[in-house]
């Protein structure tokens, strides 16, 4: 599991400068680990998840006015248009049905010059150990709806109206493709 810890340290190192002094929406926060690691970098973090149990766990030890946790549906966010400088959706697009619909909602709440950051497990490149972990995730209630290679995932983002400005594949037991994106202007 040391490999996973190294990959997550690399992920946080990539995220910190991208959220520096920004207003951030994190979707699918789970237990809030990303939001907790970015607290010193961002001006404010609105961290959401569809699971009340996950949000309850994330709120434990949350003593900062810079961070707020709430239960929200990523397909129907309650925020005004262009509310956030950065939207982060980490390790979630591969487990939700119709991830392209979530991208439409992220576009709506993201400022025109904002950044979507979407690190996602790219299961199609799994090792046998990674395949076993993917099976364990499915059994735990996180079924794979999309199984991408890194290249296919980046193409998916581009096909759905995003310009990928930066991408890195982090070596994890399941490869983690980090993508920073900007909105493509609609005509």
Annotated model-derived regions:
Residues 145-160:
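Short alpha-helix
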Residues 75-86:
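A short acidic, Gly/Pro-enriched loop at the edge of an enzyme's catalytic core
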């Amino acid at each position: 599991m040391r490999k996973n810890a190294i990959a997550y340290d690399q992920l946080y190192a990539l995220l910190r400068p991208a959220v520096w002094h920004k207003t951030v929406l994190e979707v699918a926060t789970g237990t809030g680990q990303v939001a907790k690691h970015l607290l010193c970098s961002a001006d404010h973090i609105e961290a959401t998840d569809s699971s009340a149990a996950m949000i309850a766990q994330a709120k434990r030890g949350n003593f900062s006015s810079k961070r707020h946790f709430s239960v929200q549906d990523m397909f129907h966010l309650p925020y005004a248009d262009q509310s956030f400088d950065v939207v982060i959706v980490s390790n979630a697009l591969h487990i939700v049905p119709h991830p392209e619909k979530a991208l439409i909602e992220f576009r709506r709440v993201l400022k025109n010059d904002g950044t979507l950051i979407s690190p996602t497990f790219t299961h199609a490149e799994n090792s046998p150990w990674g395949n076993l972990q993917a099976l364990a995730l499915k059994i735990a209630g996180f079924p794979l709806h999309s199984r991408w290679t890194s290249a296919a995932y980046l193409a998916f983002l581009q096909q759905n109206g995003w310009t990928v400005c930066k991408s890195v594949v982090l070596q994890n037991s399941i490869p983690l493709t980090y993508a920073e994106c900007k909105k493509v202007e609609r005509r």
